[in-house]
Amino acid sequence: MNKLLLTLVTIAFALALTACDDSASSGDSNGSGSNTTSKTTGSFPPNGDEGFYCDVTDGTNADGSYWKQIKVNIPKYKGHVEKFTFDQNGTGTQYYEDSFFYTTSYEKTAMCLEYEDGLKENSHKRNYTETYCGNGFYYFVISFQNLHLETLHSQVDDYEDDCKDYEKKWKDGDYDEFIEKRTWR
């Protein structure tokens, strides 16, 4: 009986690792995201960039659609990218990425399991067109239609304030504990 239980636990663990290993995930082609993400590396180097930064950029595409993006690098801890692209009819996409630096294989696996659970929980209310988890980062792309422009602008107008919050937390040392835990290994 103990051998059977051990075998079942081993198989379940192996399946969990296989489902979310560093090179696996779900999703389709990468054409609708931030156009700066590779399915194997994300928008940041494997352990992030050296210095703290938070950049907000925006522009207009050739088709007239508007885009706005926030990109945050917290050295030795986390990177984050969020980009909305939408037209005058309220049709577009949201790209969302989180990268975690100096993570163990166990932490990467746990992150992907949580990510997959979150996708399942929200799949009935969001139209995911692309998803990925592996190599210490995850992203998803959501497509939408006919959203009110005021709602969309309110989402992206907060990016500048978000940068101020990230910078204040960085200067106040709010991330120091996480950084220390990850880099002592």
Q: How would you name each of these model-derived features?
A:
Residues M1-L4:
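Positively charged n-region of N-terminal signal peptides that target proteins for export
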Residues L6-A12:
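Sec-dependent N-terminal signal peptides
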Residues S25-S43:
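N-terminal, intrinsically disordered, polar/charged segments of Gram-positive cell-envelope systems
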Residues F44-R185:
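Subset-of-secretome marker
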Residues D21-S23:
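Bacterial signal peptide processing site
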Residues A16-A19:
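C-terminal motif of bacterial Sec signal peptides marking the signal peptidase cleavage site
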